[in-house]
Amino acid sequence: MNQGKIITVSGPLVVASGMQEANIQDICRVGHLGLVGEIIEMRRDQASIQVYEETSGIGPGEPVVTTGCPLSVELGPGLISEMFDGIQRPLDRFQKATDSDFLIRGVAIPSLDRKAKWAFIPKLSVGQEVVAGDILGTVQETAVIEHRIMVPYKVSGTLVAIHAGDFTVTDTVYEIKQEDGSIYQGSLMQTWPVRQSRPVAQKLIPVEPLVTGQRVIDTFFPVTKGGAAAVPGPFGAGKTVVQHQIAKFANVDIVIYVGCGERGNEMTDVLNEFPELIDPNTGQSIMERTVLIANTSNMPVAAREASIYTGITIAEYFRDMGYSVAIMADSTSRWAEALREMSGRLQEMPGDEGYPAYLGSRIAEYYERAGRVRTLGSQEREGTITAIGAVSPPGGDISEPVTQNTLRIVKVFWGLDAPLAQRRHFPAINWLTSYSLYQDDVGSYIDRKQQSNWSNKVTRAMAILQREASLEEIVRLVGLDSLSEQDRLTMAVARQIREDYLQQNAFDSVDTFTSFPKQEAMLTNILTFNEEASKALSLGAYFNEIMEGTAQVRDRIARSKFIPEENLEQIKGLTQKVTKEIHHVLAKGGI
C-alpha cells in the first residue's frame, strides 16, 4: 500500500505525486472522501488516476492511497437479477444503505450480498484430484440458473474438505491441498480483474445460430452463438429496441445488458418490462436469467469505460460454467467517447476525430473476448459469449472511427436505416446494406439439423428484394405499368416479403417473437406464391387476374404473422391453398 498526495485535478483525471511504489491499473482511494480511482499512467513518481466518481470538491494536497489490486469484479451467487453500476456496485442495496436516490461519493458496498445464504450441494467428494475449472458443486441461484461453483484459476490438488449446507459467499466451503503442501480455503465467491480475459482450454468455431425471434435477423443476417454483431444507426432508428428484443427472446441461458452512457429512461424501461415478460424457452420471468449494468449518461464518464469490461468479465464467468451468454452493450460509441475524454485530459496525441490512436485495439480487445470455447477443467464442457454492440454514429454517418473500427472486427452488420424508420418499417434493418459472414455456416447447419432447404429459400427471397431495388429506378421514372408481367410480379412479391415478413411489431404480444418453424412456414408461403404465379404467367395468365384471384389467400399470408405459435398448422396449410387458388385462375382460362 502506497500513499501519495494530489497535485492536479482535471475533471475525472487526478494526478498524484509520491506514488513511486504504485503500479498501472492499481485501484486507489482518492481524497478525504476515499473516491474509487484507477491508475492509467505512471511518469516517475506521478500517477494519473481515472476517478470513477464525481471529483468536485477534491483539491491538491489531499491523500491518495493505493490498494495494490487491479479493478476486479466479485463472481459468485447473487449476480443474476441484480443491477450494478459500471464498477459493480449494487444499485438497490446502495440506495437502501445511503437512503438516497443518488450515488453518494466514497461509499463502499460489497458487490455480492454478504448476509444472503445459499444452499450449496457438493458434486465431488473428499480425496478426489481437482484442477482449475472443475465444478465442485452447485447453488440454485434462480428458478432457471444453476450456479456452478468452480475451482479458481491456478488452484489444483487434492480435495481435503467439502461441506454441504447454507453458506454466505465468504464462508469457507471447501479446502484443497495443493502440490506445495499448502491448503487453499475456498468460498462460493472468487474475484477476477476486469481487464484480463479469463483463460480457456481451446477456442472453437461458432456454428449454432442464435435464434432471436426477429425475422429479418434470423433469416437474412443471422449471428451464431459465440459470434459478434454491431448495430449502427442514427438517432431514432431503433437500436435500443433491437437490443431489448434480443435480450428478451434470444435462445441463450444468460443475458448481460450493459447500458453504457445511454439515457436513464431506457434502463427504466428494462427494469419495468423484463420482470413481467416470460422467457419462451423456460416459461420463467426474463429477469431470472439477466444481469443489468447501468451506467447512464448522467453518471460519471470514467465509469463508462469500466462498465463494458465489468459486463464481459461476468459473461466469461458464466461461460466457464458451460452456459451460452449474450452480452448487449448500448452503446459502444458512448464508451469510446469516455476513452476520448480521458485521452484528451492525458494530453495524448489524438487520432481520427479526436479519438485516441489505440481506439481500434481497445474495441478489438472487447469483441475478441466473445466466442465459443472449450472451458478449463477435467469435465469437458463448452460455453459461448455472443457480443452485440450498438453504435451511435453522429448523424448516422458510419464512416466515423468507432463504426469503422467495429466493422473491422465483427462479422455481422445490422445497418439501421433512417428512411426505413421514417416509413415506420421496424426493425429498420436495411436488407441491401447489412450483411452476415455467418450466413453460409448457419444455412448449412439448419439444412443439416432441420432436413430442410432453408438456405435456398433465403437466397431466393434475397434475390427478389435485390431485383426490386434494381427495378425501383425504372418505376420512379416511367411507372409500374411499363414493366413486364414478370417484373410486376417480382415487385408484388418483394412488397409481400417487406411488409408481411420483414416488418415486425415489437409491441404486439404475438408478432414480437417468431419461432424458427413459424418463420420457415411464413417464408415458404410467400415463395410458393411467387413460384406458382410465375408458372401461371408462363402459361398465359395475366398478372392482374392472378392478383385478383389470389387476393383472399394473400391477405391470409399477410395476417399469418399474428397467428400464435400453437396454431402453426394454419400457416403451413396456406401453401396448398396458394397452389389451389392459382390453379383455379388458370382453370378459368387466365386470358
UniProtKB/Swiss-Prot annotation:
This is V-type ATP synthase alpha chain. Keywords: ATP synthesis, ATP-binding, Hydrogen ion transport, Ion transport, Nucleotide-binding, Translocase, Transport. InterPro entries: ATP-synt_VA_C (IPR055190), ATP-synth_a_Xtn (IPR031686), ATP_synth_asu-like_sf (IPR023366), ATPase_a/bsu_AS (IPR020003), ATPase_F1/V1/A1_a/bsu_N (IPR004100), ATPase_F1/V1/A1_a/bsu_N_sf (IPR036121), ATPase_F1/V1/A1_a/bsu_nucl-bd (IPR000194), ATPase_F1/V1_b/a_C (IPR024034). One of its GO terms (biological process) is proton motive force-driven plasma membrane ATP synthesis. The keyword Translocase applies. One of its GO terms (molecular function) is proton-transporting ATPase activity, rotational mechanism. It comes from the Bacteria. Its EC number is 7.1.2.2. HAMAP family: ATP_synth_A_arch. Belongs to the ATPase alpha/beta chains family. It catalyses: ATP + H2O + 4 H(+)(in) = ADP + phosphate + 5 H(+)(out). CDD domains: ATP-synt_V_A-type_alpha_C (cd18111), ATP-synt_V_A-type_alpha_N (cd18119), V_A-ATPase_A (cd01134). The keyword Iron does not apply. The gene is atpA. It is an enzyme of class 7 (translocase). ATP binds at G233, P234, F235, G236, A237, G238, K239, T240. GO terms for cellular component: proton-transporting ATP synthase complex. PANTHER family: H(+)-TRANSPORTING TWO-SECTOR ATPASE (PTHR43607:SF1), V-TYPE PROTON ATPASE CATALYTIC SUBUNIT A (PTHR43607). Produces ATP from ADP in the presence of a proton gradient across the membrane. The V-type alpha chain is a catalytic subunit. Gene3D superfamilies: 2.40.30.20, 2.40.50.100, Bovine Mitochondrial F1-atpase, Atp Synthase Beta Chain, Chain D, domain 3 (1.10.1140.10), P-loop containing nucleotide triphosphate hydrolases (3.40.50.300).
